[in-house]
Design a protein with these regions (language model features):
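Non-catalytic helical/linker scaffolds that mediate oligomerization, partner binding
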Residues: 15-366
């Protein structure tokens, strides 16, 4: 298949063997974004580059954008905002914790006390959390239980031996936190996306239509045609999927945080439910997280990972996403190739569906 850029500044033609309908989104880090590297992924079947702003500043993100556009204007660019999240902070060194140990969590950055104290980035943390609540740190690798509430901190019991590091995610399944949908950093990156004519903004932890409307208002005020993709990562987002689909261009089923906020065994059912809703609404849907996680360290995927990709294709998803596999994994080109081959092999069983193809600002993604 011959692919030619549509931009006015370059005429780059690359021959790639990409006959699939399902698009591949690859997360790219500024630490590995050389033109030669990106060209290999493009030849392997990458259609969209994802920038994760939780781990990049604007200078780093711009480096990726510039190199992507040196490869081909046919590669769409998606920027991923942090959204309303809580993270550990103010940790000079990692903290080792043992099972059954007592530690303390606070949202007060000025609080100091004896014992192992961890600060988090949400000032009302002690106020909003109840005794008995589970607190999951670092994508669920560390599990804590609230045993006592104080005015400015929580006493926690550690349920598994682990190491807690700075800037790691903090989740409280089922809790309703009074978090702003857009942080100052999110707003700055939305402006960055507009200034650099990016294609998609994927907003994290979308809970309702208001979260989508807040971004759309910024885009409309600046006359931008960037499309908003709502990342569904908690129960509130699942419950409000109908109103979210009324306002978002499309949806990403972000199974990482979703599997922390909701019991893991429910995720396949929720994935199928959201994909069905998107098909009914004629809105594109992306399936994300750990699709080829084994290939971060190993050259071959597991059979379960192959089945996961195939099942996403069977459901009728528009795009499938790689995260660590391409951002820092040892076998990024191989991961894209595997994803493309599995998609091509299994797309023939999916009935054609008009009107849901993932479309960027100017044209359909090729």
């Amino acid at each position: 298949m011959q692919v030619t850029s549509w931009g006015n500044t370059r005429r780059i033609t690359i021959i790639i063997n990409d006959m699939k309908k399902t698009k591949i989104v690859a997360t790219i880090s500024d630490k590995r974004c050389e033109v030669e590297f990106l060209e290999k992924l493009y030849r392997a079947g990458m259609n969209v580059v994802r920038l994760n702003t939780a781990h990049q500043d604007m200078e780093q993100a711009l480096k990726v954008v510039e190199n992507v556009r040196k490869v081909s204007d046919n590669i769409a660019i998606l920027i991923d905002t942090k959204g309303p999240e809580v993270r550990t902070m103010l940790m000079d060194e990692p903290m080792h914790v043992d099972r059954g140990e007592t530690i303390y969590l606070t949202g007060d950055p000025d609080l100091k006390m004896e014992g192992k104290l961890i600060h988090v980035s949400y000032p009302y943390f002690a106020e909003d959390i109840k005794v008995g609540d589970k607190v999951l740190v670092d994508d669920g690798d560390v599990e804590l239980v609230v045993v006592e509430k104080k005015d400015h901190y929580l006493e926690m019991m550690v349920t598994n031996e682990a190491v807690i590091k700075n800037r790691k995610s903090v989740n409280v399944p089922g809790a309703s936190l009074k978090l702003k949908s857009l942080s100052d950093k999110d707003r700055a990156f939305i402006d960055f996306a507009i200034d650099n004519n990016l294609d998609f903004i994927a907003h994290s932890f979308v809970r309702n239509k208001e979260d989508v409307m807040a971004i759309q208002a910024i885009l409309d005020a600046r006359g931008s045609k960037i499309k908003v993709i709502a990342k569904i990562e908690n129960q509130e987002g699942v419950d409000n999927i109908d109103e979210i689909l009324d306002y978002a261009y499309g949806v990403m089923v972000a199974r990482g945080d979703l599997g922390i906020e909701i019991e893991a065994e429910k995720i396949p059912k929720i994935q199928r439910y959201i994909v069905k809703k998107c098909i009914e609404s004629k809105k594109p849907v992306i399936i994300a997280t750990q699709m080829l996680h084994t290939m971060i360290e190993h050259p071959r995927p597991t059979r379960a990972e192959i089945s996961d990709i195939a099942n996403a294709v069977y459901m009728g998803t528009d795009a499938i996403m790689l995260s660590g596999e391409t951002a820092y994994g040892a076998y990024p080109e191989e991961a894209v190739t595997v994803m493309r081959e599995v998609a091509e092999e299994n797309e023939g069983t999916v009935p054609p569906d008009a009107g849901r193809s993932l479309v960027r600002i100017n044209n359909e993604i090729t």
